[in-house]
Amino acid sequence: MASATDARYGQKESSDQNFDYMFKILIIGNSSVGKTSFLFRYADDSFTPAFVSTVGIDFKVKTIYRNDKRIKLQIWDTAGQERYRTITTAYYRGAMGFILMYDITNEESFNAVQDWSTQIKTYSWDNAQVLLVGNKCDMEDERVVSSERGRQLADHLGFEFFEASAKDNINVKQTFERLVDVICEKMSESLDTADPAVTGAKQGPQLTDQQAPPHQDCAC
Amino acid sequence: MAQQVSLGSLQESEREAILQVLYRDREVQNTEAERIRNLKTRLQHLRWKGAKSVSQEYKEKSCARCQQTLGLLLNRGAVCQGCSHRVCSECRVFLRRTRAWKCTVCFEDRNVKIKTGDWFFEERAKKFPTEGKHETAGAKLLQSYQKLSNKISVVPPTPPPLSESQCGGGPARLQELGQFKGFNKSVENLFLSVTTHMKKLSKSQNDMTSDKQHPEMVPRQREGRPERRSQSDTAINVTTRAGTPDILKPLGPESPRRPTSPVLKQEDISSSPVLNTSFSGGLRQGSLISINSTCTEMGNFDKADVTGEIEFAIRYCLRTHSLEICIRACKNLAFGEERKKKCNPYVKTYLLPDRSSQGKRKTGVQKNTVEPTFQETLKYQVELAQLASQQLQVSVWHLGVLTRRVFLGEVIVPLATWDFEDRESQSFRWYPLRAKAEKSEDSLPTNNGELAVRAKLVLPAGPRELQEAPEGTGDEPSQNGQLCLVVLGAKNLPVRSDGTLNSFVKGCLTLPDQQRLRLKSPVLKKQACPQWKHSFIFKGVTPSQLRQSSLELTIWDQATFGVNDRFLGGARLGLKEDLPGGAHTSSQAKLQWQKVLSSPNLWTDMTLILH
Ligand SMILES: Nc1nc2c(ncn2[C@@H]2O[C@H](COP(=O)(O)OP(=O)(O)O)[C@@H](O)[C@H]2O)c(=O)[nH]1
Ligand SMILES: [Mg+2]
Ligand SMILES: [Zn+2]
Ligand SMILES: [Zn+2]
């Protein structure tokens, strides 16, 4: 089984330094909700219907271009099984953002969301950015968790919400990019609002704005 | 969906899979650490550039970034919230979507925080203050796994480790780990050891799924060894406290550096936006300093054919702000005196470009050996940021009879790119000794800046008298000529580490009868580019005397406690040829000096290169 897993993961994280910064993202959720598939869809644009249970932890890297910056994402895929919990929670502290996933065809996985959220609160930093993702939305016929319930829970927990499908490649890219953006926002916030309002900022006409990075969404 | 796999086979595959991941992660983290080091080095340079310009001209009210003078009404500058320095409007960068701005350096600082992820570590520290900055879970896992393994190898383990052959099929990387005796402990130990790093798991740790509960724990508890967990707890604590060497092994990307003080950390840089240390008495420890030996640097020395190597280590101690060069040994040195097969080597260092005697450190002299062992640490008290502009020169010399010195070779290490955070670069290394570079400043006079002077020969009569003056009979002070010299100012002087000097000029006119007329300017405090505008007037000299005289102008940095003023550089004017070991006269200066003598009562401006 391990060899199957190994084969699924490529090994060219590469020594490429051609990026501006690195974000670490963790995907969590019950076993078999589609975390690994989701990551493979995003990183490799591939999908396998066969289920290969993830051993402990694994990761992939992907460099994206977002807001005029090259951002290297190290995306950690975790095993949902409790027996790996000690290992997986060890990775919570290093993550800037989380994708918390459930399976819209699996009630139990949805019920566990609250507990996963508690895990994040316990093991991660206070400003952890979380996106709630209801996966397998291609399986409309077998849906047991309505979009509305998903959205309500997300609101309740203060997370943003997406329904997605790793199989049909729905909202996969969007999920990651949105997560990157909210992390960027958090970053700007922590860097710039830490300073008290600047007093003597006389904005002369010669203000050197061209040095500021020219993008709309985040000041990073 | 949870599959029921037999525990034994699962453990082995799990172990392999997880270690694979840990190693892959380590590679990513190593790359990342390297990138971050590069970034921080660049920021350091930027800061240094800002700081260096302070030395160009010291001004009360100038922009901290570009040194532009700030006005009282217009362009008064404003204080940057980040660093509290006053900067001009050009040196501000406005942040997107805000009216807030930062100075160029703080802006870069912010960029670096983004790029290094330090913003995150700072935020995270609010919740986990003890968490190592770049310490990753993977590094910790590897570390704790290893610690656990070590522990098991010391204390006879229960149950005994499995046989080595179990990891036989693993990839080479895993074999490497296989040398740790505990390697074959199942991955459960890995989990257990991680568990000990964490606080008690919250209630939410309880199973959320239908997955089997702690399958890996079950057999243990049945075996009736509940103390296992605490045992491994102790193991880790002991190891940590004892600081055993395995922590230092380059296992994780960050963890090995933990024990040393990481040098290029963000906060260290930001806490010293402007260089603020000066050389102090502390710099004398651990090394011999020869004062007043500046001239020997320009003086004569022999050169042997350079052979051999020197072993030393370079470290920076953040706590004491000192650069430490640990000189260990040399081998295969050339004989200082080839015919007599004699060699009494010693090692000398400078932090170039400073070649003043205060910047010199020497080891003791070893007698009659070409394989000397020194084991001496030479120290410089210097801000880390300052080092970006410096090169470490380590040279080996033979001390012969009558203090005759023979150059045996040197190594020049540019410190700008030196990674003081890296353990590798802190360790001892052999460096091949090299001959002096062609244009080496040690064999040629050093350029220690320029001195601007204005000179005039004042004669009561016209130039005719000068031409008629008989050669060689110049002992006629009655002619009452005067040599007027205005020392205007100097620039590019070897400044102190705070970028300033308390400098003064000495003028010494040596007449043909070796009589010396000496004058001294007042001290100009806290200036890197002093403008003394001070007049030296040498009275009662005749043109013929002057043509056989020499005028030496030397610049000094006044010692704070008045012991030894530091020689900054000097220049010589005069037709007399160079004295051995003395300052040199450049041909251009010669021409200018001739002009002074041949055009009495007229001012001649000249720029003298200081050596
Ligand atoms: N129909 C459908 N199946 C999916 C989707 N994502 C994953 N799966 C399947 O669900 C099973 C578990 O997926 P996996 O990614 O291994 O789940 P993980 O345990 O959370 O990593 C596999 O058989 C996948 O093929 C999806 O979006 N749609
Ligand atoms: Mg998986
Ligand atoms: Zn400025
Ligand atoms: Zn500033």
UniProtKB/Swiss-Prot annotation, chain A:
The cofactor required is:
Mg(2+)
Q: Where is this motif: Switch 2?
A: 80-96
Coarsely, its chief localization is cytoplasm
- Please list the residues that carry the modification Phosphothreonine: T86
| Free-text activity regulation comment from the record | Regulated by guanine nucleotide exchange factors (GEFs) including RAB3IL1 and MADD which promote the exchange of bound GDP for free GTP. Regulated by GTPase activating proteins (GAPs) including RAB3GAP1 and TBC1D10B which increase the GTP hydrolysis activity. Inhibited by GDP dissociation inhibitors (GDIs) which prevent Rab-GDP dissociation.
Report the domain of life of the source organism: Eukaryota
Short motif Switch 1, span = 49-58
Which tissues is this chain's protein expressed in? Answer: Specifically expressed in brain.
**Gene Ontology BP annotations:** acrosomal vesicle exocytosis; axonogenesis; lung development; maintenance of presynaptic active zone structure; mitochondrion organization; neuromuscular synaptic transmission; post-embryonic development; protein transport
Q: Which family does it belong to?
A: Belongs to the small GTPase superfamily. Rab family.
Descriptive protein name: Ras-related protein Rab-3A
According to the entry, what is the taxonomic lineage of the organism?
Eukaryota, Metazoa, Chordata, Craniata, Vertebrata
Q: What is the primary gene name for this protein?
A: RAB3A
